[in-house]
């Protein structure tokens, strides 16, 4: 609703089901966002999930992002999540502001809206560049070989 009031219109796809779905559907209706919102539902087919993520311009994870960060970056989709890093899982470190996504102030919907708006203002027309940056982050730092070397360094005291 905040972004729509500013004349910014985005399509939203909710993938998954759960206890919040009815509340989300009510909020979508309240803010007259039905034409731009798709409740896909639960999906456990990796090929379908890959297509959904690959074709998304941005993943917004208002809660703890965890492995979702790895999943979406792996398919070239940047992510936005909250900045309360003590509550986050370690995977939040894959989000590099302005490159592979961004952060918004924890529990602040206005700042979330600003982060989304800022992302699209900065990255409009740069989808392939962003996709490649996401791939590179995963390939360079979030693969078994790199992680194994980090563990070895800890045990070797380096």
Task: Report residues per predicted region.
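Structural loop-to-beta junction motif characteristic of Rossmann-like glycosyltransferase folds
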Residues: 58, 76-85, 99-100
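Nucleotide-activated donor-binding/catalytic signature segment of Leloir-type glycosyltransferases, i.e.
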Residues: 15, 22-43, 47, 55
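Short hydrophobic signal-anchor/transmembrane segments that target glycosyltransferases
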Residues: 1-12, 17, 29-31
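Acidic donor-binding loop of glycosyltransferase active sites
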Residues: 51-64, 77-78
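A charged, aromatic-enriched C-terminal amphipathic alpha-helix characteristic of glycosyltransferases
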Residues: 124-156
């Amino acid at each position: 609703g905040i972004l729509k009031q500013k004349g910014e219109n985005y399509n939203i796809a909710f993938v998954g089901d759960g206890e919040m779905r009815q509340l989300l559907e009510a909020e979508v209706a309240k803010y007259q966002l039905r034409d731009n919102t798709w409740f896909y539902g639960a999906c456990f087919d990796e090929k379908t999930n890959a297509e959904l993520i690959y074709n998304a311009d941005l993943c917004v994870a208002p809660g703890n992002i965890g492995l979702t960060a790895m999943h979406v970056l792996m398919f070239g989709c940047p992510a936005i999540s909250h900045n309360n890093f003590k509550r986050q899982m370690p995977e939040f470190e894959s989000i590099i502001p302005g490159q592979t996504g961004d952060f918004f102030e924890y529990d602040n919907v206005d700042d979330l809206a600003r982060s989304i708006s800022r992302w699209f203002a900065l990255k409009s027309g740069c989808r392939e560049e962003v996709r490649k940056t996401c791939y590179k982050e995963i390939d360079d730092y979030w693969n078994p070989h790199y992680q194994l070397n980090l563990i070895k360094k800890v045990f070797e005291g380096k």
